[in-house]
From Swiss-Prot:
ZnF endpoints (NR C4-type): 76-96, 112-136
Keyword set, alphabetical order: DNA-binding, Metal-binding, Nucleus, Receptor, Transcription, Transcription regulation, Zinc, Zinc-finger
GO CC annotation: nucleus
Stretch forming the signal peptide: none
Keyword Zinc: yes
Name of the protein this chain belongs to: Nuclear receptor subfamily 2 group F member 1-A
Region (Disordered): 1-68
Tissue: First expressed in 11-12 hour embryos. In the rostral brain of 13 hour embryos, expressed within the anterior half of the midbrain and the posterior part of the diencephalon. In the presumptive hindbrain, expressed in a segment-like stripe in the anterior region, resembling the presumptive rhombomere units of the hindbrain. Also detected in the intermediate mesoderm, posterior to the first somite. As somitogenesis proceeds, expression extends posteriorly and flanks the 10 most anterior somites. Expression changes extensively both in level and expansion of domains between 13 and 20 hours.
C-alpha cells in the first residue's frame, strides 16, 4: 500500500496567527444597519441599554479555544489511545513511545505469528510486537529521532517519582526515590531468610524447605502490598496481577536468596516418595525441577543486585496480560516506569556493561516456563494441602500482615 506523506503543519500556527486578514464579515451587517437607519425617518427614541462591547478578536479567540480543546484530545496515531505529545515525529501515547524507543535502541527484531496484519489498538497493541513496530514506522515515527543513550526528554509530573528524599542516583532523584521504596518494601531482608538459605551446598531438610517457601511467597505478596502504585489499584486488579505472577516472583525470590534446589529433598517435600507414580510422570516432574534450577542459576550467574531484583519484580508484577483488569493501560504505564528505572539504574551503576540491561530483560520471558502447578506440588502441598495458592494470595492481600502461615514462626 502506498503511503502519502505530506508536510505536517502545527495546529498552534493557526491559533497563534489569529483570524485571517481581510474584510471582517461581522462588520458587514453593521454597515447595512447604519445605512438603513440614515434612510429611515427620524423619530425620537429612548436611550437603550448598552450592549456588550465590540470585541473584534472574539471570533479568533473562540477558534483558539476550540483548537486548544482539540489539541488536548489528540489520539495516538498508532493505537488510538490518548496522546501525551509528539514523540519521534508523531503524536503518540506513552506506551507506544516507549515501545518504539526500546525497539530502536536495542535494534530488536520481532516475528508475527499470524499474517503480519494484526490489529493494533488500545486492547491489542501488546499482542503482536512485529505489527506494532510496523505500524509505528508506517504512520511516520522516525528511527533517526531516537538518540542512543538519551535521557527521557520530558520532566516527570509532580509526585510521579518524587517519592522520597533519598540520595540522588547520579542526579536522578526520581529514579532513586522509586527504587528506594521498592527496596524498602521488602518484608524480609536476605539475611532473615535463614542461615541455610545462603549456603547453596547445604542440603535443606523438608521442614526447612517448606518454611523457606512460605517465606518467599509471603514476601512476594507483602512486598507488592507496600510498593508504590500497587496499593492504589482496585483490589480486584491486585488479586488478578498476583494470581498471574506469583510463581515468577517466587522464582525471583528463590534466586535472590540463593535457595538450594537439590532434587532429593524437593521430591521428598512434594511427597512423591509416599505415593506411587509412573516412570513417565517422575521423569516429567524432574524435568520441571531442572527448568526451575536453570532459571535460578542463570539469574545468579548475572549477579543481580537488590535494586535490580526490585525493579525486575515490579516489571513482572505490573503486567497488562492479567485477565479482567479495570485499566490495563495504567498497569502497562507502571510497568514502563519500572523498566525505565531499571534501565537508568543499570546505565549509571554498571557503565562498563552496556549489554547488562538487555540480559536482565531477556530473563523475564523464561520465568513463565517454570510451572506454577509444579511449584505448588514441590513446596506447598505439605503446607496447605489442596488449597489453591490463588486462594491464599487473595487471603493474604485482604488480611495483610495478620495472615498466619504454619511455618512463619521462626524470625
Amino acid at each position: 500500500m502506498a503511503m502519502v506523506v505530506s508536510v505536517w503543519r502545527d495546529p498552534q500556527e493557526d491559533v497563534a496567527g489569529g483570524p485571517p486578514s481581510g474584510p471582517n464579515p461581522a462588520a458587514q451587517p453593521a454597515r447595512e444597519q447604519q445605512q438603513a437607519a440614515s434612510a429611515a425617518p427620524h423619530t425620537p427614541q429612548t436611550p437603550s441599554q448598552p450592549g456588550p462591547p465590540s470585541t473584534p478578536g472574539t471570533a479568533g479567540d473562540k477558534g483558539s479555544q476550540n483548537s486548544g480543546q482539540s489539541q488536548q484530545h489528540i489520539e495516538c496515531v498508532v493505537c488510538g489511545d490518548k496522546s501525551s505529545g509528539k514523540h519521534y515525529g508523531q503524536f503518540t501515547c506513552e506506551g507506544c513511545k516507549s515501545f518504539f524507543k526500546r525497539s530502536v535502541r536495542r535494534n530488536l527484531t520481532y516475528t508475527c505469528r499470524a499474517n503480519r496484519n494484526c490489529p493494533i489498538d488500545q486492547h491489542h497493541r501488546n499482542q503482536c510486537q512485529y505489527c506494532r513496530l510496523k505500524k509505528c514506522l508506517k504512520v511516520g515515527m522516525r528511527r533517526e529521532a531516537v538518540q542512543r543513550g538519551r535521557m527521557p526528554p520530558t520532566q516527570p509530573n509532580p509526585g510521579q517519582y518524587a517519592l522520597t528524599n533519598g540520595d540522588p542516583l547520579n542526579g536522578h532523584c526520581y529514579l532513586s526515590g522509586y527504587i528506594s521504596l521498592l527496596l524498602r518494601a521488602e518484608p524480609y531482608p536476605t539475611s532473615r531468610y535463614g542461615s541455610q538459605c545462603m549456603q547453596p551446598n547445604n542440603i535443606m531438610g523438608i521442614e526447612n524447605i517448606c518454611e523457606l517457601a512460605a517465606r518467599l511467597l509471603f514476601s512476594a505478596v507483602e512486598w507488592a502490598r507496600n510498593i508504590p502504585f500497587f496499593p492504589d489499584l482496585q483490589i480486584t486488579d491486585q488479586v488478578s496481577l498476583l494470581r498471574l505472577t506469583w510463581s515468577e516472583l517466587f522464582v525471583l525470590n528463590a534466586a535472590q536468596c540463593s535457595m538450594p534446589l537439590h532434587v532429593a529433598p524437593l521430591l521428598a517435600a512434594a511427597g512423591l516418595h509416599a505415593s506411587p507414580m509412573s516412570a513417565d510422570r517422575v521423569v516429567a516432574f524432574m524435568d520441571h525441577i531442572r527448568i526451575f534450577q536453570e532459571q535460578v542459576e542463570k539469574l545468579k550467574a548475572l549477579h543481580v543486585d537488590s535494586a535490580e531484583y526490585s525493579c525486575i519484580k515490579a516489571i513482572v508484577l505490573f503486567t497488562s496480560d492479567a485477565c479482567g483488569l479495570s485499566d490495563a493501560a495504567h498497569i502497562e504505564s507502571l510497568q514502563e516506569k519500572s523498566q525505565c528505572a531499571l534501565e537508568e539504574y543499570v546505565r549509571s551503576q554498571y557503565p562498563n556493561q552496556p549489554s547488562r540491561f538487555g540480559k536482565l530483560l531477556l530473563r523475564l520471558p523464561s520465568l513463565r516456563t517454570v510451572s506454577s502447578s509444579v511449584i505448588e506440588q514441590l513446596f506447598f502441598v505439605r503446607l496447605v494441602g489442596k488449597t489453591p495458592i490463588e486462594t491464599l494470595i487473595r487471603d493474604m492481600l485482604l488480611s495483610g500482615s495478620s495472615f498466619n502461615w504454619p511455618y512463619m514462626s521462626i524470625q
